[in-house]
Amino acid sequence: MTISRNDLIQGVNEDNGLVELLAELLMIPSDNPPGDTTAIAAFISDYLKGHGVEAEVIVTKPGIANIVATIGEGDAHLVLNGHLDTFPAKVGEEWTVPPYSGLVKDGRIYGRGAGDMKGGLAALLYCFAKISQTNFKGRLTFTGTSDEETGGEWGALWLLNKDDRLHGDAVLNGEPSGLTVRIGEKSRVSIILEAEGKAAHGSFAGYVGVNAIMKMVRILPLVESLQGTPAVFTDETRALTEVVMKGYRKQYGHESETMANVLKEVTVNIGTIEGGSEDNIIPAYCKVTVDTRLPLGITPAEITEMMKVKIHEVDPSIKVSWKRPPQIVTESTYSGTGER
């Protein structure tokens, strides 16, 4: 069947199937943790089968199910990607409706993961099924991945390393983006700083013992000084960043310049500090977790080395390590545009 682009869009606009699909996805819990996506992957498989598309459910770990389906032929290859798991619906949250109700009311739909990202997942899945009924040029792959909320090791990363169907010319990711098209996101590097001291009774502070918290306090300004480290642009990545900044300016209004500049520099958030057991004991240990976000042109290894050099100039006893080693899929936070 051949259908025009306009007819396809009109058909989607007149059909309530997308809303119904999203409601059904919301009624299937896929909280992570624990991360069990068996039921939602099975539902998607049946949904695609109902549209004449065979999908493969890939279990990478007990309870961790991913789903992949490919249609079409040819060299040009677009991948549609969304994740199946959601942030947990925690006890004590002020829900006005049950979190797995999929309730549609007054032009809105309610449920855990409606925004992140079962809304995007439903849109990709629905369009994939619709396009499968048409004659189109090239290949189209749908991937529903798991484990996104806890790092992706058993979801997207596993599939990228094991399944060539995910290696397309481009990927359209359904993550919420403020209704603007985004070309990527800043790389996240979570770094742990650890200081060791020597415990003693608090009444002897300054005479005996070594306060690990104070050791950490002295180096935290050095960590924060990495805030604003500028990106290292090529001509291409500078041009792409400027395009995305235009979207930020439109989205954030009067704060546009400030918000847009976040794409040009490193951000540093000293997120957690742990240390000490009682206020009358000199703390023997202190741990700080730092969330750094990288612009184009700066690698995880480079920012960690910058931090380590600054810290060790003042206190070489501070341990600097990864919370979880970054999973490198490409050598940069940006891999360049394709030829097509």
State where each predicted segment sits.
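Class I S-adenosyl-L-methionine
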Residues: 42-49, 125, 132, 304-315, ...
